[in-house]
A protein has these predicted regions:
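Glycine-rich, basic loop-to-helix element that forms the pyrophosphate-binding segment
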Residues: 53-70
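Active-site-adjacent helix/loop segment of glycosyltransferases
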Residues: 191-253
Length: 253
């Protein structure tokens, strides 16, 4: 089996010297999509290519663009702020290949200090989203009050099937992407990973958390810094788009 990696750089040139040397030896090819001026890496590994956009595109558009430029049986999307441990990709690919209906696999993601990040999730509910994205989270801390959403009662050291996985580092089966139409380019920012997991689920594909694979993620969590910002507005609009596209999710609460 072959693995192609797609990295989207939107002004992330400074982070690529950490990611690319760690990622490139683990995959067959890497495509870096530079989405705006100043996004190009200073140097490319031998198995990497650069695509430079004439105008900025949305994240999902860039992922689809990079995917079309690759040929691997599996497509790995990696955020510029991630750094995989040695053999992280092999661990993901080995597990995913052992399950014929595994369409998406995600690693154990950790903060730079080694603390586990809760990247495996259940699909959001209306009530849960309101708590997480409003001042209510100060009264009802999500990681304490929404254990089911974050699968906190599951062992972090054991594989578990999740509804969706945070889109920082995802291994995706190409046949699944082709079947469901890739990433939904209608999202401006945020929720693309939730939508991807939901459409994969509807098509009968599994989504797995694989802790044998470890990735460091220096996540800024921009959308959580302030209650009123352009990022929270983008997130709200994306959630509204998700509900419009999948109105049956409203029945979840």
């Amino acid at each position: 089996m072959s693995v192609s990696a797609v990295v989207v750089s939107h002004g992330h040139a400074a982070e690529l010297p950490l990611l690319l040397p760690a990622l490139a030896p683990q995959v067959d090819e890497v495509v870096v999509v530079a989405n705006r001026p100043g996004s190009e890496p200073a140097a490319l590994p031998a198995n990497a290519r650069l695509l430079v956009n004439e105008r900025p595109l949305r994240l999902a558009e860039n992922v689809n663009l990079g995917t079309r430029a690759t040929s691997g049986d599996w497509v790995l999307f990696a955020n510029p702020d991630t750094v995989p441990e040695p053999d992280a990709v092999a661990a993901l690919a080995s597990f995913a290949a052992s399950r014929p209906r595994c369409g998406i696999a995600g690693p154990r993601v950790e903060w730079p200090d080694g603390t586990w990040q809760p990247t495996r999730r259940r699909f959001p509910t209306v009530s849960g989203t309101l708590v997480r994205r409003t001042p209510l989270r100060l009264v009802f801390p999500p990681l304490e009050r929404q254990r089911a959403h974050y699968l906190l009662d599951e062992d972090v050291d054991e594989p578990v099937e999740a509804d969706w996985l945070l889109g920082a580092f995802l291994l995706m089966r190409r046949t699944m992407l082709e079947e469901i139409g890739g990433w939904d380019a209608g999202y401006r920012h945020y929720v693309e990973d939730i939508d991807l997991g939901y459409r994969a689920m509807r098509a009968g594909w599994e989504r797995w958390y694989v802790p044998a694979s470890r990735v460091r993620h220096d996540w800024a969590q921009v959308s959580d810094r302030r209650f009123l910002s352009r990022h929270t507005l983008w997130h709200a609009r994306s959630m509204a788009r998700f509900v419009r596209g999948h109105p049956e999710t409203l029945r979840r609460g």
